[in-house]
Amino acid sequence: MAARSLWAVQRLQRLLASGAMSESRGWLHPFSTATQRTAGEDCSSEDPPDGLGPSLAEQALRLKAVKLEKEVQDLTLRYQRAVADCENIRRRTQRCVEDAKIFGIQSFCKDLVEVADILEKTAKCCSEGAEPEDHRRTLEKVFQGLSLLEARLKSVFTKHGLEKMTPIGDKYDPHEHELICHMPAGVGVQPGTVALVRQDGYKLHGRTIRLAQVEVAVESQRRL
């Protein structure tokens, strides 16, 4: 009987102890949750660190600087190419201007050649003709004037690079000579060379502007 009473008392003590522990846990749990919740709210309400903002701004500036540097390099390359193209255009234009300056008077010189032919023939006729005594002085003056005019024209031609071609004895060249006819080769005349010049040719700075009208010597059996 006493043993049963002791067992009942011990069991009651264990039940009371377990109930007290459960109750204490119930009281502690709400306080723990509230503490955690308050700590979380406090952490979330705090401002971000001061160094975070400037770091992002600095990174953005660096990226922008790299982009601008690439653009500068690209523009510099384009500028260099443009300068090179302009220099090439300037050189080509300069060559064209020089060519125009040299050969721009080609047509003018070609027209003057006809005048030179007339003056030369007139001067030759006046010097060889037999005229009456009363006209001799006048003809002498005319001849002197024509001679001076011819000399002046030759001086102008030389100044502008106009050269007269009298290719007697030269080998026939279709780029410089206009073949009028063939004639038998005389003594000392090589076949295929110019035997007679009907009309002188002219060159302007080495470029033929008028072919010389010539007769070319050939062997007797090949006469045309």
Swiss-Prot record:
Q: Please list the residues that make up the transit peptide in this record.
A: 1-31
Q: Which UniProt keywords apply?
A: Acetylation, Chaperone, Mitochondrion, Transit peptide
Q: Name one Pfam family in it.
A: GrpE
PTM sites of type N6-acetyllysine = 141
Which tissues show it? Ubiquitous.
Q: Which InterPro entries match?
A: GrpE, GrpE_coiled_coil, GrpE_head
List the PROSITE patterns.
GRPE
Recorded GO cellular component terms are: mitochondrial inner membrane; mitochondrial matrix; mitochondrion
Q: Which domain of life is it from?
A: Eukaryota
Q: Which GO terms describe its biological process?
A: protein folding
Which locations, inside or outside the cell, does it occupy? Mitochondrion matrix
Described function: Essential component of the PAM complex, a complex required for the translocation of transit peptide-containing proteins from the inner membrane into the mitochondrial matrix in an ATP-dependent manner. Seems to control the nucleotide-dependent binding of mitochondrial HSP70 to substrate proteins. Stimulates ATPase activity of mt-HSP70. May also serve to modulate the interconversion of oligomeric (inactive) and monomeric (active) forms of mt-HSP70.
UniProt subunit comment: Probable component of the PAM complex at least composed of a mitochondrial HSP70 protein, GRPEL1 or GRPEL2, TIMM44, TIMM16/PAM16 and TIMM14/DNAJC19.
Give the PANTHER family listed for this entry: GRPE PROTEIN, GRPE PROTEIN HOMOLOG 2, MITOCHONDRIAL
Family membership noted in the UniProt record: Belongs to the GrpE family.
The name this protein carries in UniProt is GrpE protein homolog 2, mitochondrial
Organism annotation: Mus musculus
Starting at the broadest rank, the lineage of the source organism is: Eukaryota, Metazoa, Chordata, Craniata, Vertebrata
